[in-house]
Amino acid sequence: MENEGWHEGSLLGLSGYYWQSCTLHAGVKLAVFTLIGDDSLSVETIAERLKGDRRGTETLLHALTAMKLLQKERDRFANTPASRSLLCKDSDGYIGHMILHHHHLAASWVRLDEAVREGKPVRERASYSEGEWRESFLMGMFNTAMRTAPAMAEAIDLSGCHRLLDLGGGPGTYAVHFCLRNPDLKATVYDLPTTRPFAEKIIGRFGLSDRIEFVPGDYMKEDIPGGYDATWLS
């Protein structure tokens, strides 16, 4: 009977892969990549700016280098082109929010066996606040949608529409790109009240506060607003 490609080494590699995930999560959570930016910095400088332990900082930096997320020349560390583009907060391609969301989910995933036995969700409160969890989730949705929303806005013809409802719109990424694509369009982002500050931040970033409004509500419990030419459910 074929082993379908699995062997001792590949299974142990799969089992221990979380070591790399946790290393990436730590680098993003500590904003190591953002701190380095376009510079090339020593362990001492990075540890001082992180307010971290020198030995711990050095170990993390070497691990990130082994993963090819940093590059080391002599005694200094710098970002790779990929980490500069994807893991620095000042980059348009930043995906750190989604990575932090994965980090926040990890504490529950290690209790999967418990969830199977008890038949109910498991949510572990760890070293982050509800606000941090919400920000990583919503801004992670923004990170993800930024890769698909422009193409969606181009592919879907809303030229005859004047009012769009973005139902469960989160940070409003799709509403933003539909409005950017259609100058005569105005939109409403409808989502839970706790989503509002994140949506308004994104809408303002794109200069669309005069065309996109946020309406708080729960479409699972309340009537969905009417009077729109089109509705987007993402």
Q: Where are the regions a protein language model picked out?
A:
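Conserved class I S-adenosyl-L-methionine
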Residues: G160-G170
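Conserved SAM-binding loop
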Residues: A199-E200
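Conserved Class I S-adenosyl-L-methionine-dependent methyltransferase catalytic core
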Residues: E2, E8-K29, T34-S40, R49, ...
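Conserved SAM-binding loop of SAM-dependent methyltransferases across substrates and taxa
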Residues: P171-N182
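A short acidic, Gly/Pro-enriched loop at the edge of an enzyme's catalytic core
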Residues: M220-T231
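Conserved SAM-binding strand-loop segment of SAM-dependent methyltransferases
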Residues: L208-Y219
